[in-house]
Amino acid sequence: MNKLKIVFMGTPDFAVGCLDFLINSNHEIKAVITAPDRAAGRGKKIIQSEVKKYAINNSIKLLQPINLKNEKFINELKLINADIFVVVAFRMLPKTVWEIPEKGTINLHASLLPQLRGAAPIHWAIINGLSETGVTTFFINEKIDFGNIIEQSKLKINCKENTGQLYEKLKSRGSNLLVSTLKIIEKNDFKSIKQTNSEKLLIAPKLNKNNTRIDWKNSGQSIFNLIRGLSPYPSAWTKDEKSNKILKIFEVIFHKEKNSKENLSGTIIIKNNTIKIITYDGFLEVLELQLEGKKRMSYLEFINGYKNFHYQRLS
């Protein structure tokens, strides 16, 4: 297989796994594009992206443009003379960037497109209770996550796993798919497929304070899916009505019961060294949680410190 000259674009840890896989393949990484450094925390400490750290450690040419439409940046990209751009978890690219390479610009998306277009496909696959997801490579065009599909790889979702666990599986699966996709592009041995569009398609919007809050009017199964879909980050949350403090919940087991307890939904029961939260169709057995201002703790640690939460309501 001939070497493809690649410019890689990405920012988080998910992208690092893919970049590492590409470096150890037969291709040549000519440059890495990642997000500018940012100040974070109370001390405004400068944070570098995971991709930047990797590029520096591996002595790869690095660019951190603030404005992707900047003429100087565009010219520098053109001078690299790459065959293809590879994008994994990066910003939306302007046409002046993605149209540069001869073989196009491809993106890796952590879902089976056209399902779950958007910023958080791994989280929403679990939140929606899907039994299957996967990864997709596609050509970037004007609309986000709408380009022609090149390849896909499917993966079963365990009914008990959380987003953190699925993330690791998809990172590995995505790395392999990228190498496979580059191989068929290099040989020109593929036929890309136009994406379908339908009102029935699930979407994967950016996570925020509203869509991560637990609604205790929902079924126990849907709350269970929300909690594991948001674990370990950013976490599903609720509020204790008495103290008005936020309670983050990371791990639960759902127990379905026939007798409806709709009027008790969201009530905490601490009994026999267990924490239960009532739902209208059963209860959630809480294994790991975090009260506002406190550390993340096991259910036993919580019981030892907060027995007064027995029979309190969450909202």
Language-model segments: residues:
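N-terminal Rossmann-like dinucleotide-binding module
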Residues: 1-42
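Donor/substrate-binding cores of folate-linked one-carbon enzymes
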Residues: 3-4, 24-25, 35, 84-203, ...
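N-terminal beta-loop-helix "entrance" segment that forms/cooperates
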Residues: 38-58
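Glycine-rich, highly charged phosphate/nucleotide-binding loops
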Residues: 63-72
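Short amphipathic alpha-helix with an adjacent loop that forms part of the alpha/beta core around
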Residues: 71-81
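Internal anion-binding site segments
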Residues: 198-315
